[in-house]
Amino acid sequence: RLSRRRVYSIGGRRRRRRRRSRGRRGRRRGRRRGRRRGRRRGRRRRRRRGGRRRRR
């Protein structure tokens, strides 16, 4: 965080807006992908067991 604050103060208002938008988009994409992978693995195992029992 310290390095980013220093860059903002040097860059000014224009660079602040552009860099913040890119940082937020990149962070959201990375977090969503990581969380989806973990949840999908857990749900797949549970769905296979529950789905087979319910269908039979």
UniProtKB/Swiss-Prot annotation:
Tagged with keyword Phosphoprotein: yes
Spans annotated as Disordered: 1-56
Superkingdom: Eukaryota
PTM (free text): P2 is phosphorylated in immature sperm. It is dephosphorylated in mature sperm allowing a stronger interaction with DNA.
A cellular component term, taken from the record's GO annotations: nucleosome
Biological process per Gene Ontology, one example term: spermatogenesis
Ranges that cross the membrane: none
Tissue: Testis.
Compartments, record wording: Nucleus; Chromosome
Keyword list, A-Z: Chromosome, Developmental protein, Differentiation, DNA condensation, DNA-binding, Nucleosome core, Nucleus, Phosphoprotein, Spermatogenesis
Keyword set includes tRNA-binding: no
Functional note: Protamines substitute for histones in the chromatin of sperm during the haploid phase of spermatogenesis. They compact sperm DNA into a highly condensed, stable and inactive complex. Octopus spermiogenesis is characterized by a double nuclear protein transition: Histones are first replaced by P1, which allows the chromatin to adopt a shape that is not as relaxed as with histones. The majority of P1 is later replaced by P2, forming a compact chromatin. P2 is the main protamine of sperm.
Name of the protein this chain belongs to: Sperm protamine P1
